[in-house]
Structure formats: C-alpha cells, structure tokens
Amino acid sequence: MARTKQTARKSTGGKAPRKQLATKAARKSAPAAGGVKKPHRYKPGTVALREIRRYQKSTELLIRKLPFQRLVREIAQDFKTDLRFQSSAIGALQEAAEAYLVSLFEDTNLAAIHAKRVTIQPKDIALARRLRGERS
C-alpha cells in the first residue's frame, strides 16, 4: 500500500456542548436586547495617577480627626491614665504623624522602584526604616 500525505482536518468528534442554564442564557441575551450601556471605566492606573496628583497638590490632613484623637488617647492610656490634651496638641501630633508617614511612603516607593517594581511591599518599608536608622 502506498503512503499518502495526511492533511489536517477539523475534528467533528468529542463532547457535545452542554446546554446553558436558563439564567445564564437570559443574562447573555438581556444586554443585547435591552441595550443597557456599560458604565465607563478608566484604564488601570489612570485613577491612581489622578489621585496622586490631587493629594500632592493639597495640604489638608488625610487622616480623620476623631479617629486619630481616639488612637492618641488610647496609646496615652498605656503611659498614664487621666491625661488631658489640648486640641492644638492633638493637631500638632496629627501633622507630625502624617508628615512622617508621607516621608516613609516616599522612601518605600524608592525602595520598590530600586527593586524594579511598582508595588510597595512590607520589605520595602522595613528597608526604608532600616536605612533611616529606625528600629523595626
């Protein structure tokens, strides 16, 4: 028997497609029939960059005042009970805390970029604190 060249053909065998559930079929056909428009979505990263620009321009405090005040009072309880705070003292603490956090995140971002990443990780924060000479 002579050898013949084989050509690729589409397969007709295999499993038959399963029937869709009624709800899935209804869901697929509904948007086409009703013409419901999908909400607009920005590309990933666009909104993040917009927020970065917005917060770099602003000078207002980003942590809410009352939760920060509760945290300060809770931490102060460990050292001495019945402490009282002037509102300006809590405001100064909040300003200092936010300035520290912003600075730490800047250094953390530099550490992530140095590692050829764009996402910060806990090890970046640890490295930034270590380079600053802070205890971790």
Swiss-Prot record:
Family matches, as CDD domains = HFD_H3
Q: What does this protein do?
A: Core component of nucleosome. Nucleosomes wrap and compact DNA into chromatin, limiting DNA accessibility to the cellular machineries which require DNA as a template. Histones thereby play a central role in transcription regulation, DNA repair, DNA replication and chromosomal stability. DNA accessibility is regulated via a complex set of post-translational modifications of histones, also called histone code, and nucleosome remodeling.
Q: Which residues carry this modification: Phosphoserine?
A: 11
Family classification? Belongs to the histone H3 family.
Modified-residue entries (N6-acetyllysine), positions: 10, 15, 19, 24, 28, 37, 57, 65
Q: Which residues carry this modification: N6,N6,N6-trimethyllysine?
A: 5, 28, 37, 80
Write the record's keywords in alphabetical order, separated by commas: Acetylation, Chromosome, DNA-binding, Methylation, Nucleosome core, Nucleus, Phosphoprotein
List compositional bias (Low complexity) regions by residue number: 22-33
| Entry GO terms, CC | nucleosome; nucleus
Task: Tell me which domain of life the UniProt entry assigns to the organism this sequence originates from.
Answer: Eukaryota
Q: What is a single molecular function from GO for this protein?
A: DNA binding
Please report the PTM annotation for this entry. Answer: Phosphorylated to form H3S10ph. H3S10ph promotes subsequent H3K14ac formation and is required for transcriptional activation through TBP recruitment to the promoters.
Region annotation (Disordered) maps to 1-41
Q: Where in the cell is it found?
A: Nucleus; Chromosome
What interactions and quaternary structure are annotated? The nucleosome is a histone octamer containing two molecules each of H2A, H2B, H3 and H4 assembled in one H3-H4 heterotetramer and two H2A-H2B heterodimers. The octamer wraps approximately 147 bp of DNA.
In this chain, where does the modification N6,N6-dimethyllysine occur?
5, 15, 28, 37, 80
- Organism in which the protein naturally occurs: Mycosarcoma maydis (Corn smut fungus)
Residue numbers carrying N6-methyllysine: 5, 10, 19, 24, 28, 37, 80
Q: What is this protein called?
A: Histone H3.1
